[in-house]
């Protein structure tokens, strides 16, 4: 292996760093990527990152070099950019970038034990890879997807960016108008509110977004009325699509925030389901006795899910979801169902 502490002569790189020539450094990143010069690309990353100590702001070149190494580099080189200082200005977690084009069997020997190894394992498992049992469950949920989980939307990173369309973009929906009349009892549920805010946190903290939830004793239409939506449409969707939509939201950075990655999105979706099903207080107990996955899956598949349309076309990032849960008391035949409406929006700034 390369001793990265020993100075290597690289006259072209050193000249560009000394001149703080960002444009030419980006071209050099392109050249070394296309030539598969991973050693040279890693050296570029190291020296542009160190340039800040002499007052040169070359972090865009360092960030681009990290991105290319993680995306295209041989596994040994790709894993070198997963240190604690990397990815600070990246468009998404480098653990997700690395997982896109590298198999776990090739990555595992080069990943030291710790959270980043675990995050890569989660990401690879979501892509259908078989990951061994030696990985810590740092996200509090099983590494391999469960039988009841859907195929989650995976990001596609490219040379400069990332694409990850919402699973709702291609869904075929049958709409019907919401009821004109409403009769509901509002329920204060701080767990649902906090779970939604956690789910779309980058949309609201790093961007222009908003998030709002309501819980009512009432129907799906009642829940929308409680949100202040008097005219709108509902379409039934299957539990898998609802789960995939939640996970997509949790993975996304919204219009201007930093993407958090599919592994985090999946955890946020589990936590949102737990909040809707009233399982948050018992999460740790269920996890310790190995019942958490079954409990979350049971809430998901036994809930009626709806997408709603409130006429808002301005938001590129949206969650418009209603959950309708039956009362779980078998003795209560006349129980009113529980309606949970989740609304989140984010959109690019209009200059």
Residue positions per predicted region:
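Extended, low-hydrophobicity segments enriched in charged/polar residues
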Residues: 52, 62-265
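Generic detector of well-ordered alpha-helical segments enriched in charged/polar residues
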Residues: 14, 26, 30, 193, ...
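Detector for Asparagine
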Residues: 3-5, 101, 158, 208, ...
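Charged, amphipathic alpha-helical stretches
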Residues: 1-68
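C-terminal, beta-strand-rich globular interaction domains
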Residues: 229-351
């Amino acid at each position: 292996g390369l001793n990265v502490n020993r100075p290597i002569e690289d006259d072209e790189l050193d000249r560009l760093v000394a001149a703080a020539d960002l444009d030419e450094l980006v071209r050099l990143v392109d050249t070394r990527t296309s030539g598969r010069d991973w050693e040279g690309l890693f050296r570029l990353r190291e020296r542009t990152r160190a340039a800040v100590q002499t007052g040169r702001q070359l972090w865009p070149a360092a960030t681009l070099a990290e991105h290319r190494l993680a995306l295209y580099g041989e596994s040994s080189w790709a894993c070198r950019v997963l240190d604690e200082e990397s990815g600070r200005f990246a468009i998404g977690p480098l653990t997700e970038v690395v997982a896109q084009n590298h198999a776990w069997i090739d990555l595992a020997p080069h990943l030291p034990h710790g959270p980043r190894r675990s995050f890569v394992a989660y990401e690879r498992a979501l892509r259908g890879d078989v990951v061994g049992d030696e990985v810590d469950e740092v996200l509090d949920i099983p590494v391999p997807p469960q039988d009841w989980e859907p195929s989650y939307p995976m990001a596609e990173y490219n040379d400069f960016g990332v694409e990850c369309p919402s699973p709702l973009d291609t869904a075929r929906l049958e709409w019907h108008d919401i009821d004109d009349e409403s009769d509901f009892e509002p329920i204060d549920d701080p767990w649902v509110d906090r779970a939604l805010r956690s789910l779309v946190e980058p949309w609201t903290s790093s961007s222009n977004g908003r998030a709002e939830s309501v819980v009512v004793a009432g129907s799906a239409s009642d829940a929308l009325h409680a949100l202040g939506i008097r005219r709108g449409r509902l379409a039934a969707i299957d539990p898998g699509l609802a789960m995939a939509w939640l996970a997509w939201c949790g993975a996304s950075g919204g219009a201007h925030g930093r993407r958090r990655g599919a592994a985090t999105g999946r955890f946020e979706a589990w936590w949102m389901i737990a909040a809707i099903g009233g399982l948050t207080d018992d999460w740790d107990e269920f996890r310790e006795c190995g019942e958490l996955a079954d409990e979350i899956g049971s809430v998901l598949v036994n809930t009626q899910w709806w997408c709603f349309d409130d006429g808002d076309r301005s938001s590129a990032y949206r969650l418009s979801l209603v959950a309708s849960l039956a009362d779980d008391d078998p003795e209560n035949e006349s129980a009113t169902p529980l309606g949970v409406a989740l609304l989140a929006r984010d959109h690019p700034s209009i200059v």
